[in-house]
Amino acid sequence: MKLTCVVIVAVLLLTACQLLTADDSRGTQKHRALRSDTKLSMSTRCKGKGASCSRTMYNCCTGSCNRGKCG
């Protein structure tokens, strides 16, 4: 019985901590574009800086294609 009460209290405490930290971290991601570009380069096969590219086929890791070159 005591063990059950301790487990219930521990679960309630952990849940409260999760809810508090979730509220504090809302909207604090500052560099979303940088993070998404990093994920893009890690999850897909993309071309590095200076490689040839076309505007119709978005495949540059840097995210920009200028004058036929990834920039």
UniProtKB/Swiss-Prot annotation:
Disulfide-linked positions: 46-61, 53-65, 60-70
Molecular function terms, GO-annotated: calcium channel regulator activity; ion channel inhibitor activity; toxin activity
SUPFAM superfamilies, per the entry: omega toxin-like
Signal sequence bounds: 1-22
Key words of the record: Amidation, Calcium channel impairing toxin, Disulfide bond, Ion channel impairing toxin, Knottin, Neurotoxin, Presynaptic neurotoxin, Secreted, Signal, Toxin, Voltage-gated calcium channel impairing toxin
Subcellular location: Secreted
InterPro entries xrefs: Conotoxin, Conotoxin_omega-typ_CS
Positions of the pro-segment in this chain: 23-45
Domain of life where this protein originates: Eukaryota
In-chain residues carrying the UniProt-annotated modification Cysteine amide: 70
Tissue specificity note: Expressed by the venom duct.
GO cellular component: extracellular region; host cell presynaptic membrane
Summary of the function given for this chain in its UniProt record: Omega-conotoxins act at presynaptic membranes, they bind and block voltage-gated calcium channels (Cav).
Family label: Belongs to the conotoxin O1 superfamily.
Notes on the domains: The presence of a 'disulfide through disulfide knot' structurally defines this protein as a knottin. The cysteine framework is VI/VII (C-C-CC-C-C).
Official protein name in the record: Omega-conotoxin-like Ac6.4
Biological source species: Conus achatinus
